[in-house]
């Protein structure tokens, strides 16, 4: 399975050299990214009408990053060339039989003269050849050091993600630090959290086909993969792109600044010893990272013998992931207590959840209908949402579908379901930037509510006498205190954190040491949500809108 068409963006070496010169010429600030104004100046030389240029930008910037890297620039130039020769420009052209590799560069009126004038000036640095912003991450990494956080200029923001980093450091992070949001809800964000590739997490009871599912998508096994009928995967494995095939231990992964897993250190060495990263070169992993999880156990005793907080780890990954696949087996439809807790920990991420009924070719059509009904019944008691979750039925493995059980109708159904699921996965990189904005806004709202709760608890404490007794009373009646905060500030009840978890963390703190309400700080976050983020999206939208 390919996330993007291989043809678009590939070209001969001669054409690549031409495009490289054009890219360097049009990239006025030499940061390896062509943004709105640069694009308008350069693309105008093609003499194409504005609606066609708008469509070309939309297709080239398919991930909606707000800029074109070198690879996206090549795609744009190839589309310009096609438009000049009379082709209709649409998304379908990428999957058509057009020979992208041998498309001649487009005609750009007056470009040769302008480039000749610029020849005497020093050449700008080489752009990142693969189109990803990896070369630019070092430019923004130093923003996260406390000394430089106040000095980030607006001109240094060259993408939507850069803009989110700047807003986080200058406006949201001070609120999180003041009210200890990182201790109660989620660790502070780092540079790598913003630059990470989209992630897909697979959850399910043992032997429901999680590892086989990843193997099926990659069309090869990954380092450290174990497949069998018994509980084989005994650890959390992140499968991501890398220069060679290797497994990296969890403690090493957690301290690497270029990986978004530093927040996992809060779960301790017991968890990190059950966590590893598998790297391998693969075109699919250039766009998506997979998280393979241990099979959820069915017995309460096995759960209590885990040395780490399995539900907490799952919840941490859920907040980082773009898609969560719950895998079920027709022979394992019971939702165990631990699985129920795991699904409950996904609260707030309902839009990411997809249910997969795997190994469906192991039962005949009549049994499959009954199994599907039983699965819906089981999930209805666990997923406390009125909306229906999308359920995919199929057999996601390299083995041919067992037609003896399902018949030709079953085969056709499974193939259509597989196509739908693959289409969902293909959409992930395209929606990654939108998802990042969505998660950022969600985090900002959670931080605001957290600040209201903490400042309210501080306000309820006595000035001098009886502090210990007052603190215990507040902790015991925490649900009532949440209700007071909700009514006082007119907040939605569903946005409040889990009471039991909050109580557990709160019991280790002295409420009297907490900060009072700082209206100015909260107003800054409100302004960020109301004005700064819409302005950021406006600045990096399609320049031809």
From Swiss-Prot:
Region called G3 motif, residue ranges: 292-295
Record-annotated disulphide pairs: none
Domain EH residues, every copy: 15-93
One cellular component term from this protein's GO annotations in UniProt: endosome
Keywords: Calcium, Cell membrane, Coiled coil, Cytoplasm, Endocytosis, Endosome, GTP-binding, Hydrolase, Membrane, Metal-binding, Nucleotide-binding, Repeat
Residue stretches making up the Dynamin-type G domain: 194-429
Residue numbers spanned by region G5 motif: 382
GO BP annotation list: endocytic recycling; endocytosis; hyperosmotic salinity response; protein homooligomerization
Compartments reported by the entry: Endosome membrane; Cell membrane; Cytoplasm
CDD domains: EH, EHD
A Pfam family per the record: EH
Chain segments carrying region G2 motif: 230-231
The protein's assembly and partners: Homooligomer, and heterooligomer with EHD2.
Protein name per its UniProtKB record: EH domain-containing protein 1
Native organism: Arabidopsis thaliana (Mouse-ear cress)
Lineage: Eukaryota, Viridiplantae, Streptophyta, Embryophyta, Tracheophyta
């Amino acid at each position: 399975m390919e996330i993007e068409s291989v043809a678009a963006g590939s070209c001969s070496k001669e054409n690549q050299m031409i495009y490289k010169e054009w890219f360097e010429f049009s990239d006025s600030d030499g940061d390896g990214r062509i943004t709105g104004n640069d694009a308008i100046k350069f693309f105008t030389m093609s003499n194409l009408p504005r609606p066609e240029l708008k469509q070309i930008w939309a297709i080239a910037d398919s991930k909606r990053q707000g800029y074109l890297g070198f690879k996206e620039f090549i795609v744009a130039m190839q589309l310009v060339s096609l438009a000049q020769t009379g082709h209709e420009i649409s998304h379908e052209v990428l999957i058509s039989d057009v020979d992208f590799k041998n498309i001649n560069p487009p005609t750009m009126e007056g470009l040769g003269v302008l480039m000749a004038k610029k020849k005497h000036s020093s050449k700008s640095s080489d752009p990142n050849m693969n189109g990803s912003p990896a070369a630019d991450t070092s430019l923004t990494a130093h923003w996260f050091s406390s000394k430089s956080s106040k000095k980030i200029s607006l001109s240094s923001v060259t993408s939507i993600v850069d803009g989110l980093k700047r807003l986080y450091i200058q406006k949201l992070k001070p609120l999180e630090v003041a009210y200890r949001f990182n201790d109660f809800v989620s660790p502070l964000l780092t540079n790598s959290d913003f630059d990470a590739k989209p992630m897909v997490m697979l959850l399910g009871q043992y032997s429901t086909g999680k590892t086989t599912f990843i193997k099926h998508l990659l069309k090869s096994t990954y380092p450290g993969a174990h497949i069998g009928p018994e509980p084989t995967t005994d650890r959390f494995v992140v499968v991501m792109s890398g220069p060679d095939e290797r497994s990296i231990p969890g403690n090493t992964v957690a301290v690497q600044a270029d990986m978004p897993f530093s927040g996992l250190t809060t779960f301790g060495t017991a968890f990190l010893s059950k966590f590893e990263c598998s790297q391998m070169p693969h075109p699919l992993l250039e766009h998506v990272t997979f998280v393979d999880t241990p099979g959820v156990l069915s017995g309460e005793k096995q759960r209590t013998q885990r040395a780490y907080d399995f539900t907490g780890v799952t919840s941490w990954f859920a907040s980082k992931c773009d898609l969560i696949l719950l895998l079920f087996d027709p022979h394992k439809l019971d939702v165990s207590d631990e699985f129920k807790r795991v699904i409950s920990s996904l609260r707030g991420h309902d839009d990411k959840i997809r249910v997969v009924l795997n190994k469906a070719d192991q039962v005949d059509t009549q049994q499959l209908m009954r199994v599907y009904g039983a699965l819906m019944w089981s999930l209805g008691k666990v997923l406390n949402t009125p909306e229906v979750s999308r359920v995919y039925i199929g057999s996601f493995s390299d083995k041919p579908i067992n037609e003896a059980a399902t018949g030709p109708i079953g085969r056709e159904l499974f193939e259509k379901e597989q196509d739908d699921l693959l289409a969902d996965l293909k959409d992930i990189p395209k929606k990654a930037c939108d998802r990042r904005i969505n998660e950022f806004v969600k985090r900002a709202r959670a931080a605001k509510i957290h600040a209201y709760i903490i400042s309210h608890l501080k306000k309820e404490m006595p000035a001098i006498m009886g502090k210990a007794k007052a603190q215990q009373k507040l902790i015991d009646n925490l649900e009532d205190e949440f209700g007071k905060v909700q009514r006082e500030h007119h907040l939605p009840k569903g946005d409040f954190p889990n009471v039991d978890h909050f109580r557990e963390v709160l019991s280790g703190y002295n409420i009297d040491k907490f900060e009072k309400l700082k209206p100015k700080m909260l107003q800054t976050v409100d302004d960020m949500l109301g004005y700064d983020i819409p302005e950021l999206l406006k600045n990096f939208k399609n320049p031809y809108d």
